[in-house]
Design a protein with these regions (language model features):
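A structural signal for short, well-ordered beta-strand segments
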Residues: 52-54, 136, 155, 168-172
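Short acidic, gly/pro-rich beta-turn/loop elements at beta-sheet edges
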Residues: 61, 130, 144-146, 161-165, ...
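Hydrophobic beta-sheet segments that form the core/acyl-binding groove
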Residues: 116-160
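Hot-dog-fold acyl-thioester-processing enzymes
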Residues: 2-115, 177-187
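Intrinsic-disorder/low-complexity, polar/charged segments enriched in Ser/Thr/Lys/Arg/Asp/Glu/Gln
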Residues: 38, 44-51, 131-133, 150-152, ...
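Surface-exposed, gly/pro-biased binding rims or lids
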Residues: 158-187
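A short acidic/small-residue loop/turn micro-motif
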Residues: 56-57, 140-141, 172-174
């Protein structure tokens, strides 16, 4: 599989407004930030992107734990983690690493929605204070329905030093620009 150089891929700054009627007209006319209008045909297998980095703080880790009711001693009890835990310090909940890691490369593609996730693995522990980043790679395209195809992408979350901590594959259902052309295999 060849990887397309990032420089040849035009980034999306925003999609044209849908002109919502419940805000000032001059605001409603602006392009939408962090939104894409890509269709199935626009996704290229092998295309890769890397996110910015982010450091996971104790506060946000504990907020997430409280929100999802995850109070396992490894993520919520400093004394247990230091004295009895196998890592000697508190972990960040895997569900938070998953959420934050995918969020780092998330965009709002108006022609796509999530079909599901496969192969989710927590490969190495992530600790409070660790800095992470994510690499997304488009793995496959599969025509599926009359108006929609499936895009499979891998998400690899790394610590700042390059150690992988999480892997998963996300399947998205994406609208065809021209269903007749895709269904005939002529993309």
């Amino acid at each position: 599989m060849s990887v397309r150089p990032a420089a040849s891929f035009s980034p999306t700054v925003g999609v044209h407004s849908t002109h919502p009627t419940d805000m000032p007209e001059d605001h409603a006319a602006l392009p939408v930030w962090n939104a894409e209008n890509w269709f199935y045909e626009d996704f290229e297998v092998g295309h890769r992107i890397r996110s910015l980095r982010r450091t996971i703080s104790e506060g946000e880790s504990m907020q997430f734990n409280a929100l999802v009711l995850d109070m396992h001693p490894y993520v919520g009890d400093q004394m247990f983690a230091e004295r009895e835990g196998m890592f000697g310090k508190r972990l960040v909940a895997g569900a938070f690493v998953f959420s934050a890691g995918l969020g780092l490369v998330a965009t709002n593609c108006v022609n796509a929605f999530s079909y599901g996730y496969d192969k989710l693995r927590f490969i190495k522990p992530t600790f409070i204070g660790d800095t992470i980043y994510t690499i997304r790679t488009n793995l496959a395209k599969t025509p599926k329905y009359k108006d929609l195809g499936l895009i499979r992408a891998s998400y690899e979350v790394f610590k700042a030093e390059g150690e992988i901590v999480l892997y998963c594959e996300h399947i998205q259902t994406v609208r065809y620009r021209d269903p007749a052309n895709v269904s005939q295999g002529n993309e």
